[in-house]
């Protein structure tokens, strides 16, 4: 039996708040949540680790060089059929957050989302966070 990683690599995103940029973004999001929370009707949760596939995986790399090398070693097609632009992503290196909705059956015919979260809370949290970052 041969075991290897066969899918493309989508880097995990972790925001521990170690840098000034990370702290500023986290503070802006937390402040935005406090503004929106009274009208949210549901609990708004924050997580410092986002384990799902996201386009934000192309904005920062949280893994060190040894972890990336271990991944490449365990992907037989790495460098042949697939490469991940780690060096270019490290040049971008911006803190990211995923302010998103929730629902059921994502990307399926039966997909549905919580309308208040999707069309009210998410835009308002995003707006408030950006406003704080730019002020």
Predicted regions and their residues:
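An extended, acidic, His-containing surface patch that forms the Zn2+-binding/catalytic region
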Residues: 1-135
């Amino acid at each position: 039996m041969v075991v290897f990683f066969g899918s493309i690599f989508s880097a995990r995103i972790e925001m521990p708040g170690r840098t000034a940029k990370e702290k500023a973004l986290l503070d802006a999001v937390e402040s935005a949540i406090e503004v929106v929370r009274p009208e949210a009707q549901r609990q708004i949760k924050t997580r410092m680790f986002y384990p799902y596939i996201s386009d934000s995986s192309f904005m920062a790399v949280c893994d060190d060089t040894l972890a990336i090398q271990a991944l490449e070693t365990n992907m037989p097609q790495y460098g042949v059929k697939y490469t991940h632009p780690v060096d270019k992503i490290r040049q971008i290196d911006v803190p990211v957050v995923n302010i998103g909705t929730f629902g059921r059956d994502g990307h399926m015919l039966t997909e549905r989302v919580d309308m208040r979260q999707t069309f009210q809370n998410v835009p308002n949290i995003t707006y408030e966070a950006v406003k704080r970052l730019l002020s």
